[in-house]
Every structure is written in C-alpha cells, then in structure tokens.
Amino acid sequence: MGVGFMGAYNLYKNPSGERIASTSRTVYEIDHSLYLNLTNSCTNECYFCPRLHSNFYHGYNLRIQALPNGSELIHMVEFPRRYREIVFSGFGEPTLRLGVIKYVSQWVKDHQGRTRLVTNGHGNLIHKRNIIPELIGLIDTMSISLNADTPDNYIKFCRPQFGIETYTNVIEFIKQSIKYIPTVEITTVASPGINTQKCLELAIELGANFRLRELIPPRHKLNQN
C-alpha cells in the first residue's frame, strides 16, 4: 500500500494556489522522511504551535479523526528502507502513545529502517518513569523541542500542563537521551521572545546537536468540526 491515510483523501488549492489535503493524514512524507501522526493531544500549549490555529502543516491536514494502531501504521509504511527515516511525530506529543512507538519502531528496525522520535521531552512525566532505556535499539535519533532558556520562560511560551517543574524534567530527559540514544538534537523555534542563542549554548553544554526551526505562520483556518 505504501504511504497511506485513514478515510477519503482529496486535494484542493488554497487561495495561494498551494495544493493541500482536505482530509486528515495519518502518514505523510517530507524530504524523503515518512512521518507518523500518532495523536492530536499534547501536554504543551505552545503559543506558536500550528495546531492551535490550523489543521495544516506543510500542506497536510494533520487533525486526525481516529488514533491509528500499530498494525495500521505498519501497513501504511510498508517498506521502511524506502525512506531516509521513519519519524514518530504529528500534531500532538507522540510519547503519549509510547506502546505504539515501541511496537512500530521494533518492526521498522527489524526491516532495516531508521527511526526518529520528535518529542517535547515530557515522556518521563507522562509515564512517571524513565522511558528512555525502553527505546534502546528502537530509536536512532531523538529530536527534543526546547523553546525556552529558563523555567519561567518555558511556562510563558510553552504553557505545559505539568507546571513549573516541567523545564528541569525536560533537561533531565535530554541528559538521559544522550546516555542511551545514538543521536540527540535539541530543536528551538525561531519565534519572537525566545532566546535561541541561549538554547544553542545549552545544547552545546549538554552535548546535544542543535537545530533552529522555522516559525510556521498560520495559513489555514482551524476547522473545529
């Protein structure tokens, strides 16, 4: 089957002429990587997040109507080596569905594919344990979003449901990831008010790679239906 979706899939053009999907995508491709959209739910409410003002990202409607299970995702991926990497990501926080991540990533590794997990670093808070050792041999690259240089700024910009202690827990999540995962990168959105230089310096101090992410402006209205 290859790259797949759940439900009918149609394309139309927005006012700028961009072709976009009118039905939500569970699996979508960007730059030869295949992204698995696991959930709409997140433990942050970052003020710059596309999911707060749109259903769309890179022309794909990512507001899924049903949560895909592991078998469905495997069926959609089909040939992992076709892609540069299989990325656990989407509109929400993927570690909310840790079991699915472990199930699918094991299958991907069994079929000689590469994996990456995009996360806000709340996985240990969500599951009340250190989940990183459970991902040894399953995740090749961890991309951890860190959009603030202090606990107070993290509250201001990311509005985490776990409160003021979230920031220090994310830092610890990064440290644990560096211990167990082959490649770890900290990513920061280039948004007004966020001290990206401080985030870069923190990444260097911790021993992680650093990548500055483009701020995605709203281009499509949020559909609440």
State each model region's role.
Residues 2-15, 21-24, 79-81, 86, ...:
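Auxiliary Fe-S-binding modules of radical SAM enzymes
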Residues 33-35, 85-89, 114-116, 141-143, ...:
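Structural preference for beta-strand elements that scaffold enzyme active sites
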Residues 59-65, 156-164:
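Short glycine-enriched, charge-decorated loop/helix-capping segments at active-site entrances
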Residues 52, 114-119, 162, 168-169, ...:
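Contiguous, function-dense segments enriched for cysteine-driven chemistry
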Residues 21-68:
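Canonical Radical SAM [4Fe-4S] cluster-binding loop centered on the CxxxCxxC motif
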Residues 136-151, 210-216:
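Non-cysteine beta-strand/loop elements that form the S-adenosyl-L-methionine
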Residues 71-91:
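Short Fe-S-cluster ligation motifs
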Residues 56-74, 94-137, 148-149, 189-197:
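Canonical radical SAM enzyme core domain
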